[in-house]
Every structure is written in structure tokens, then in C-alpha cells.
Amino acid sequence: MDTRLMDLLVCPICKGPLTHDHSSHELHCAADRLAFPIRDGIPVMLESEARALDESPSQAAPLSE
């Protein structure tokens, strides 16, 4: 992911900083303990697509109810 883009992106929930996890292709918000997927090089910054960081990617379920 482009570092210039990373400088602009923030968590859509708390507006905090995100970190790029290269191994899981996700952006992580440490404050909310959420991981946002990156699909085809595009970050999916929707709360409904995020997973809790306590889950493994294979166990992930959308957070929306």
C-alpha cells in the first residue's frame, strides 16, 4: 500500500491512526481493536466489513447486527 495513502487514512470509527499488516492484507486500528480488509489493493473502510482483532482472519464475521 502506498505510504502517502497511509498518511491520509484514519479509522472511520474513532478517527485514530491505522497500521498496515502486510501479512494479513489489513489495516489495523489499535484503539478500536478492528482490522479493515484490503481487497485488490483497495482498503475497505466499512465498519460492517471490519473484524475484531481478537479473531483470526478465517474466523472473521462482519460486526454489523
UniProtKB/Swiss-Prot annotation:
One of its GO terms (cellular component) is cytosol. Coiled coil: none annotated. Gene3D superfamilies: 2.20.25.10. InterPro entries: Trm112-like. Pfam families: Trm112p (PF03966). Belongs to the UPF0434 family. This is UPF0434 protein Mpe_A2486. It comes from Methylibium petroleiphilum (strain ATCC BAA-1232 / LMG 22953 / PM1).
